[in-house]
Each structure stands twice: as structure tokens, then as C-alpha cells.
Amino acid sequence: MDISTITSYIENLVNTPSPTGFTKLAEKYLIDEFEKLGYAPYQNNKGNVIVPINEMEGANGLLLSAHVDTLGLMVRSIKSNGALRVTTLGGFPLNFVEFENVKIYTRSGKEYTGVVRLNNPAVHGSDAPREAKRNDETMEVVIDAITHSKEETEKLGIRNGDFISLDPRFRIDNGFIKSRHLDDKASAGVLLALAKEIKEKNIKINRPLYMMFTIYEEVGHGASAGHPAGISDMVAVDMGVVHEDLTCDELKVSICAKDSSGPYNYDLTNDLVEIAEDLKLDYGLDIYPFYGSDASAAVASDYDYRHALVGCGVAASHGYERTHEKAIKSLFDLLVNLVKK
């Protein structure tokens, strides 16, 4: 498959706002795209999008998962100056979103743009830009509307609990894909491309195969319930960690041996390693010191699965992230061969 097909899916997903808890647009995008490919996606009560790729009798099914919820913000309170105090959706330091453009979604359906910044952001006014801690007391969202008071902001329809998405700033330069939310929309785009490849090339699959796109992974319970029946193996497709003492980088596919939840299934992880070596893929086998996946959430919720974790190497996780087309293509090739196995 041409890499541009995969990156187009990734770009479309990245540009579809879906902070965790506010993912309706991404859910609709997935459903529409899978229906175009001739599949019959459905949603469980939680809202995860589940796609039967190869339905057949048997209890040895394979479930591939990715998540489409992303980091974001929520209005904690409206300040006396009309700006917004915020709380984070997912785990990241607020300095990772300093000076980022945002969009605020009211519960009545209105949308406003704004920017995240320090309460006192002018370098010509104080030492705050150099010295201030970055937290929810020292930073705020200023709205692109004329408001100088809590009352004026309330008249806009903005209230506590409104969701806020971050501008992803997607771009590709010399093969490097740079954007927010590559965790995990890069993986979701790869799975969409995989489903397209299976359908268009009539790839023979010898076991039940499902895909699941979760919407609460960033807060820990994305794959905790509502799975299709007959699954024995689950592979979470999620970003690979790039760090100074790990083997993965932005050009590689990453296979995880252990994360914060403990080790992944030995045999299923070895299957991924064997495929990567047979294909002569550039890959890394690593532990992720601060990480949890949908697969680990599933086994912690008493699903009797062998579980594994694989993804493209993503640098600067939970910030302005970067991977490379080579890593995306390697991940795609690994998954094509996994479903044939």
C-alpha cells in the first residue's frame, strides 16, 4: 500500500478533535470510513467502535485495538478576568501546551477558539515567563472573544465542564510526521489502512479477526469492557516510546516486552518479534517505564487473553510528537503478516 494512503487516514483522524470523553466526531469518522470499505462497524455501550473484519466460528479470535481519544483540557472554572482555569484530560504537564491554540465546545453546541498561556505571559512585563511554574494556577485559556469578566464569559454560553481540544498542527517534512495526537491516531490510521488492504486484496485470514477503537484509553479504561466474543489474543497497537536508554527511535516499529502493568504475553510478543525479523524490519524491543495500554486494561478486567503491544516509534510523547513514514510502513507490514499468520 502506498504510504500516502496511510498518512492521509492519519491526517484526517488527527484533524478530527476527540479529547477523551468528547469523541463523537472521531467515532463517526471511523464508522463512515469502515462502511465505505464494506464493513459493518458497531459500537458497544461505552462507545468503542468495533469492526468485524473476518467473522467465523472459533474461539481463537484476534483483536487489534487502537484508541482515538486524545489529550485535551476541560474548563475547571471561569476566572474573574473572563479567562478559563482548566484541568487536563489525560496525563501531561501544562508546559507541553503553552501557547497552543485551542477550541472550546459548549454543551449547547457553540464553539470558540482561544489560546493557552501564562497568566502574565509578556517577557517585557515581568520575569514570570522565565520563572513561573506551569500549572493550572499560573496558566489560563484566553478566549478569542471580547470578555473581561466571569459574567461576560458566561453570556457566551461557556461553563464549567466544557471540553477543549488542542490544535494538532499536522505536517509532514522529509518523511517525518509531526503532530499532536499521533498517540494514538497514527495507529488508528494504520488499522484503517490494514482493513482497506484486507478488503481490496482479499487477504485470506484463518481466524476470527476484529478491530476495536477505544475512546477512554488516556484515562485507563478504554478496553475494560464490551469486547466481541471468541477472542483469545489481543494486540494493542499504540505508540512506541522513544527515550535515551531504549532501542526504538522514530524510524522503527516498537514491540513492548513490559510496561507499568507488567510483562506482556511471552509467546504472543515473540510472534511479533519473529515476524519483524523475518521481514527484516527495523524494530526495537523495549520496556516502557511509564505506560499502560488497552491490552493491559483488558487483562486487568478479567479478559482471558494473551496480550501484546506494538506501535510506531513516537518521540516527545504527549507533546508535539514526531514519527516517520518508515516506522508507519514497518508497523503496517508487521500487522499485515500478523493477520495472515
Regions found by a protein language model. Give the residues of each.
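N-terminal hydrophobic/helix-forming segments and targeting peptides
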Residues: 1-341
